[in-house]
């Protein structure tokens, strides 16, 4: 099951207690103090691992805690440090303080590891409290409590290209055609129920990651449909690919305006993101060239942007508008190269 939002309480380990002990050896009846210190409590870490893809392992968990430190022992022996707790999460996981809403960490890279909570210090043994006026102290410190927090984890998948479109527009077909992703494909709405990532190989040395989310419907930004729940997963992408159905009963203009409106309402980040447009199912209708030209003319788009001298594109307009057909393999190769070219220009 795909889980992208979980809450739990986490606690670092408590420090072990210091030891009250006195030296006991043959012929030494009243030896001095030799109580050792307690071990420190274990820390809590979060670590991003590319082999982790969901937060499902933490669903339903109430408390996750590191190990407590062991108590000190006689003969000045230190207690063992408590084992650290390392919580593995997928890259793209944001870690929040659930009480304050503060963003604590944002793990984007594989292998990234952060210290979230420190374990408590171990208590001092009675060997530390010997003094001229107290040669046999019968006191040792208790260990200190470890830090604790209510934590919320939120996963936003990391991909280069994010697909945005209405249900049944052909997103799943496209990602299965040009990548290694194998989503369910059928002729009904909401075939895609969870986000999917696919690696697109353009040539022997180049490629990029594409993300498919459930279809957007009008009113998605207010919570209608499935798409709103997963729009956050394309916030990290470098470019959005708006997919518009050429065979739909609604005009290309109406579909595009609705998609832009929903993504803009959802977040400013999506509204200001670089985007391109793919006109899908071009094999199922006639006069596709005319439809493409009329669509671009209505908005004042060119079919392809040329970046400025700094390599920047105008984000208020699509980088390109291209008609495609996954079923007929029309312009699929051209689409891959066009997307790769844009991604390279962003680096």
Swiss-Prot record:
Stated family: Belongs to the TRAFAC class OBG-HflX-like GTPase superfamily. OBG GTPase family.
Record's subunit section: Monomer.
InterPro entries assigned: G_OBG (IPR031167), GTP-bd (IPR006073), GTP-bd_Obg/CgtA (IPR014100), GTP1-OBG_CS (IPR006074), GTP1_OBG_dom (IPR006169), GTP1_OBG_dom_sf (IPR036726), OBG_GTPase (IPR045086), P-loop_NTPase (IPR027417)
Described purpose of this protein according to its UniProt entry: An essential GTPase which binds GTP, GDP and possibly (p)ppGpp with moderate affinity, with high nucleotide exchange rates and a fairly low GTP hydrolysis rate. Plays a role in control of the cell cycle, stress response, ribosome biogenesis and in those bacteria that undergo differentiation, in morphogenesis control.
Residues binding Mg(2+): 172, 192
Native organism: Campylobacter hominis (strain ATCC BAA-381 / DSM 21671 / CCUG 45161 / LMG 19568 / NCTC 13146 / CH001A)
Disulfide topology: none
Key words of the record: Cytoplasm, GTP-binding, Hydrolase, Magnesium, Metal-binding, Nucleotide-binding
Domain OBG-type G residues, every copy: 159-344
SUPFAM superfamilies the record matches: Obg GTP-binding protein N-terminal domain (SSF82051), P-loop containing nucleoside triphosphate hydrolases (SSF52540)
A Pfam family: GTP1_OBG
Protein name from the UniProt record: GTPase Obg
Single GO BP term: ribosome biogenesis
Enzyme kind, highest EC tier: hydrolase
UniProt KW Cytoplasm keyword: yes
Cellular component GO terms held in the UniProt record: cytoplasm
Cofactor: Mg(2+)
Residue ranges of domain Obg in the record: 1-158
GO molecular function, one term: GTPase activity
């Amino acid at each position: 099951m795909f889980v992208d939002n979980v809450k739990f309480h986490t606690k670092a380990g408590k420090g072990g207690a210091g030891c009250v002990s006195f030296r006991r050896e043959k012929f030494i009846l009243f030896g001095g103090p030799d109580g050792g210190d307690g071990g420190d409590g274990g820390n809590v870490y979060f670590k991003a691992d590319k082999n982790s893809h969901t937060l499902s392992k933490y669903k339903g968990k109430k408390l996750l805690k590191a190990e407590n430190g062991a108590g000190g022992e006689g003969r000045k022996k230190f207690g063992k440090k408590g084992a650290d707790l390392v919580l593995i999460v997928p890259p793209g996981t944001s870690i929040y303080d659930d009480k304050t809403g503060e963003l604590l960490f944002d793990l984007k890279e594989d292998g990234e590891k952060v210290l979230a909570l420190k374990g408590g210090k171990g208590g001092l043994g009675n060997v530390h409290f010997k003094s001229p006026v107290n040669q046999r102290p019968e006191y040792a410190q208790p260990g200190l409590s470890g830090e604790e927090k209510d934590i919320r984890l939120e996963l936003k998948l990391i991909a280069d290209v994010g697909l945005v479109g209405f249900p049944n527009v052909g997103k799943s077909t496209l990602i299965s055609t040009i990548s290694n992703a194998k989503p369910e494909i059928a002729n009904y709405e909401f075939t895609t129920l969870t986000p999917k990532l696919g690696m697109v190989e353009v040539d022997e040395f180049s490629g990029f990651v594409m993300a498919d989310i459930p279809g957007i419907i009008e009113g998605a930004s207010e919570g209608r449909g499935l798409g709103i729940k997963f729009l956050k997963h394309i916030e990290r992408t470098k470019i959005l690919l708006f997919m518009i159905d050429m065979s739909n009963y609604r005009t290309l203009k109406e579909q595009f305006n609705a998609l832009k409106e929903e993504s803009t309402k959802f977040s400013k980040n999506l509204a200001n993101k670089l985007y391109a447009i793919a006109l899908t199912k071009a094999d199922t209708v006639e006069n596709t060239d005319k439809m493409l030209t009329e669509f671009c003319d209505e908005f004042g788009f060119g079919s392809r942007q040329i970046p400025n001298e700094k390599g920047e594109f105008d984000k208020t307009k699509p980088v390109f508008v291209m008609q495609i057909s996954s079923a007929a393999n029309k312009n699929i190769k051209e689409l891959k190269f066009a997307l790769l070219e844009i991604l390279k220009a962003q680096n």
